[in-house]
């Protein structure tokens, strides 16, 4: 796995680095940025507590990942994730 950097903004909503790794360890959906940002991806998944999380990260030029957002999924994101998980 690539080295992962966490922006302070990633922790703004009370989630932690551990939550990010828990999403990666489970069943997640990876999509390109819904805002059309280059080299930015979104993960929809769950942590071990069962929270539905939305993670946004950028792939840096040196191939490291910079996570800058972790928060609960919106209702639309949750429905999309649940369709994927079936």
Give the positions of each predicted feature.
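Ribonuclease/tRNase effector modules and their secretory precursors
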Residues: 1-86
